[in-house]
Amino acid sequence: MRLALGALLLISLDSVAAQAPLRFVIPDSWTMPMVHLEQGKPTQGILYDVMLSLATQVGLPAEFHVLPRARVQNAMEQGEVDVRCYAAQSWLPQQSGDYIWSIPLFTQPDLLITQNARPTAVNPADLSHQSIGTVLGYSYPTLQPLFDTDQLHRDDARNQELVLEKLLAGRNRYAVSNQWSLDWFNQRLLPDQQLHSVVVLQEQNVGCYVRNDPQVPVQRILRTLVRMKMSGEIDETVRLYIGGEPAAVDKSETTKNRPGQDPGS
C-alpha cells in the first residue's frame, strides 16, 4: 500500500512538473506591433503571438512576466523567467549565465525617419545641431559619436510609439524607429501625414534565447522555433500586423551595418 501511494505521488509530481509554465519576459517599454499591454498584461502583437504559439507547440502553458527593461536580463540570470525573445547576442556583451540561442527569427532595421512628405537621403553626420527622437535606454551606435560631440542631442521618450507621436507633432525634424513600429504607426495615418525613412542606421538579426536549465525543455523549444521559422509561420505573423511585406529599404543608404542594442524594442 505504501509503495502504491508513493508511486501515485511520483506520478502526481511528474504531472505537475510537466505542466510548469514556460515563462517569457516582456519589457514594459514594448508597444505595438510587438505587444499590446492592457493593465500590465499582453493581449496581442507579433511577439505575443509568436511566444504563445511557441508555448502551445511545446506543450506548456505560457506565462508572461512584464518587467522594466532594466530588470529583464537580471530576471533571466536569477531564473525568474525562461525565455527572452527579440534579442541579439551583440546587445548583451556582458551576459552572464548559461543560455542557448535560437536561429535568427527576424531582421529589423533601425531607421532615421522624418515627417517631411518629400524626404531625401540624409547622412546623419551632415545634420546641423538638433535633437533626435530616441527611446530612453536604447543605444544607437551609428549616432553615438554625434551625440558624444553634441552635434546631435537625444530627445528620449519612454517607448517607440511616443517617439513617433512627438515626431508627428513636430517636436523634432528627425527620429529613430524600427521598421515594424514605423509601418504600424503609418497604418492609421493618411498618406500625406505618414512618416518616412531617410536612411538605414543599422540592421540586426534577432531571435530568442533560452535559459539552459534541466527544468526547461531547451532543445524542444529551439526545434519548435526552427519549425515555426521554416514553415513561414513567423513571417506570416509579422505580415498579419504590418500589412504585407515591410517597406523595402535602400541598402545603399545604410550608413553602417553595425549591430545596435535593443533597436526599437
Which role fits each region the language model picked out?
Residues 64-126, 136-140, 198-200:
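Acidic, polar ligand-binding/catalytic clefts
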Residues 18-97, 134, 156, 221, ...:
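Extracytoplasmic small-molecule ligand-binding "clamshell" domains
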Residues 51-60, 102-103, 124-128, 136-158, ...:
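Ligand-binding cleft/hinge of the Venus flytrap
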